Swiss-Prot record:
Designated name of the protein: Large ribosomal subunit protein uL2
A Pfam family hit: Ribosomal_L2
Keyword Calcium carried by entry: no
Compositional bias segments (type: Polar residues): 36-49
NCBIfam families linked: rplB_bact (TIGR01171)
Family annotation (PROSITE patterns): RIBOSOMAL_L2
PANTHER family membership: LARGE RIBOSOMAL SUBUNIT PROTEIN UL2M, RIBOSOMAL PROTEIN L2
GO BP: cytoplasmic translation
Organism: Burkholderia vietnamiensis (strain G4 / LMG 22486)
Start-end of Basic residues biased regions: 50-59
Gene name of the record: rplB
């Protein structure tokens, strides 16, 4: 993997920094593990914008990634590493001994030809998936389930990981990259190691068009709008917001807590804000 600073042939390319990985597969993805996805452009079923700054972008297929890793006791061989346009992490195509192929999140250090295993008897090695009750305390893990059998939901982005801190009864404590310490049931599964493609954060977009390719539209400041469009809008000439920062709907922003799910609050041992 190499970090390439592009030759400044234009203003848009002058600041561009790319992450090039020669080990990724250059051909087409595995057709049996593709699915179609339509662009919603941030609209719901009523046609109203529910997520701003989305729209356009290049069409791409969804890669069906195995987040459950339930083929216990069946060894798998890594056939190739691939780019996935739907996520920051790379994915790996693995071939199981029974002939089935699946995509998984590629952990750091994974190589073509490497053997992987899942289940309670799997060795403690990067890329193997085990129930948390079988993972030693202090191990770095990723792709962590929040409910047994639901599939991995935490620590799935490029370069992320978590650490298994302790086990108490039927729960284990996991420290996430944000600093939050969370309780997880010991029957939940996790994968050993950290997610690969950690250089993803070092890339520089370089020009606005590169974000448009990704389906990201411009973000307009509230003070540049009219009063009808944003609480910060209006005024003669350049003016400040005139109030504490708020969202377009008047909710305080920059540190204001909006978490409303009280049902799972007991699973958070220490918040990431440490207040």
């Amino acid at each position: 993997m190499a970090i390439v600073k592009v030759k400044p042939t234009s203003p848009g390319r002058r600041a561009m920094v790319k992450v090039v990985n020669k080990d990724l597969h250059q051909g087409k993805p595995h057709a049996a593990l593709l699915d179609t996805q339509s662009s919603t452009a941030g609209r719901n079923n009523n046609g109203r914008i529910t997520t701003r700054h989305k729209g356009g972008g290049h069409k791409h297929h969804y890669r069906i990634v195995d987040f459950r890793r339930t083929k216990d006791g069946i060894p798998a061989k890594v056939e190739r590493l691939e780019y996935d346009p739907n996520r920051s992490a790379n994915i790996a195509l693995v071939l199981y001994a029974d002939g089935e192929r699946r995509y998984i999140i590629a952990p750091k250090g994974l190589t073509v030809g490497q053997q992987l295993m899942s289940g309670s008897e799997a060795p403690i090695r990067a890329g193997n998936t085990l129930p948390i009750r079988n993972i030693p305390v202090g191990t770095t893990i990723h792709c962590i389930e929040m409910l047994p059998g639901k599939g991995a939901q935490m620590a799935r982005s490029a370069g992320t990981s978590a650490m298994l801190l302790a086990r108490e009864g039927v729960y284990a404590q996991v420290r996430l990259r944000s600093g939050e310490i969370r309780r997880v049931h010991i029957e939940c599964r996790a994968t050993i190691g950290e997610v690969g493609n950690e250089e993803h954060s070092l890339r520089q977009i370089g020009k606005a068009g590169a974000n448009r390719w990704r389906g990201i539209r411009p973000t307009v400041r509230g003070v540049a709008m009219n009063p009808v469009d944003h609480p910060h809008g209006g005024g003669e000439g350049k003016t400040a917001a005139g109030r504490d920062p708020v969202s377009p709907w008047g909710t305080p922003t920059k540190g204001y807590r909006t978490r409303s799910n009280k049902r799972t609050t007991t699973m958070i041992v220490q918040r990431r804000h440490k207040r």
